[in-house]
């Protein structure tokens, strides 16, 4: 079976590797990925995508594009004569491309569809406090993330999972699901299930605005929000006029002695080893953070170097 594989980030790499390992059944004739990104360091070579890096290590042909709607790209895919197109964390494909594959094109999506359709399903599942998520393979159609489902696999979200750790778990589960899907297609034994649109939910693209911490929330919700955005792009707030990224926080369970002014959302309270922030129903302890211009630090290290000049005024995170 001739396969064109399309993907860009780390999430897609295990799927590419699993397909390549089964070369007695599958032949990857082309790997499509995004273009190399320029590095910040002067005179440094552009940085290849994780998928390109893996493909080159596997000795596979690579085509780079940031415009899957171009006529040139469609011609390249057509010339590859794919039986199947496999997509994992790539751009939106037009019908002119995904219809080229003789046996169809399918996508690996990091949720249990129709839940969390969209660009950031891993993040939003954690942010919304889900205990279980999963991976789905489905045939592509013109409307994004709505095609008929082939296989699904549940994955438990652990209490200490952040988006990075959950993505790693889902990528491994997803790779196995991709290979299983390919075997079903190869055997002509695929059965599909239509998505129930009434059960659909959205996982919109992460932006500067929707990753900002809103302190007027409950402690548990804030901690889910923070771990759902860690380690990238990271939940953020402002401290004394500077951007503060927060990577880990936990609700405060033991009582503390509070200053007379009491608690309010965003109010900072510092003791010898903890940086506490008020919420609508309690306090959370910020455990890993990064102030603008500084490295990522644990709270104790951060507090050793932290100076707040206006001690008479409460320090608020905004």
Swiss-Prot record:
Signal peptide span: none
Reaction catalyzed: L-methionyl-tRNA(fMet) + (6R)-10-formyltetrahydrofolate = N-formyl-L-methionyl-tRNA(fMet) + (6S)-5,6,7,8-tetrahydrofolate + H(+)
One Pfam family hit: Formyl_trans_N
Molecular function GO labels: methionyl-tRNA formyltransferase activity
Gene Ontology cellular-component annotations: cytosol
CDD domains reported for this sequence: FMT_core_Met-tRNA-FMT_N (cd08646), Met_tRNA_FMT_C (cd08704)
UniProt similarity note: Belongs to the Fmt family.
Protein name per its UniProtKB record: Methionyl-tRNA formyltransferase
Originating organism: Chlorobium limicola (strain DSM 245 / NBRC 103803 / 6330)
């Amino acid at each position: 079976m001739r396969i064109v594989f399309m993907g860009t980030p780390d999430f897609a790499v295990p799927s590419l590797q699993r397909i390549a390992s089964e070369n007695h059944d599958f032949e990857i004739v082309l790997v499509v990925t995004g273009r190399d990104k320029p590095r910040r360091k002067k005179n440094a070579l552009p940085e290849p995508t994780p998928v390109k890096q893996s493909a080159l290590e596997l000795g596979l042909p690579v085509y780079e594009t940031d415009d899957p709607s171009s006529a040139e790209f469609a011609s390249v895919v057509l010339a590859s004569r794919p039986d199947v197109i496999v997509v994992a964390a790539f751009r939106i494909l037009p019908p002119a491309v995904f219809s080229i594959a003789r046996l169809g094109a399918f996508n690996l999506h990091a949720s249990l569809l129709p839940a969390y359709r969209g660009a950031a399903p891993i993040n939003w599942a954690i942010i919304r406090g889900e205990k279980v998520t999963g991976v789905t393979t489905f045939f592509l159609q013109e409307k994004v993330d709505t095609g008929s489902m082939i296989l699904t696999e549940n994955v438990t979200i652990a209490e200490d999972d952040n988006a990075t750790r959950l993505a790693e778990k889902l990528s491994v589960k997803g790779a196995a699901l991709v290979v299983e899907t390919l075997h079903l297609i190869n055997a002509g034994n695929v059965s599909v299930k239509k998505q129930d649109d009434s059960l659909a939910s959205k996982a919109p693209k992460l932006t500067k605005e929707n990753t900002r911490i809103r302190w007027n929330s409950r402690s548990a919700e804030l901690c889910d929000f923070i771990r759902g955005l860690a380690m990238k792009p990271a939940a953020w707030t402002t401290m004394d006029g500077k951007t503060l990224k927060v990577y880990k926080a936990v609700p405060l369970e033991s009582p503390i002695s509070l200053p007379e002014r009491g608690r309010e959302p965003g109010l900072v309270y510092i003791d010898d080893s903890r940086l506490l922030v008020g919420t609508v129903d309690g306090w959370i302890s910020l455990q890993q953070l990064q102030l603008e211009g500084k490295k990522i630090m644990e709270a104790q290290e951060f507090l050793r170097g932290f100076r707040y000049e206006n001690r008479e005024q409460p320090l608020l995170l905004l």
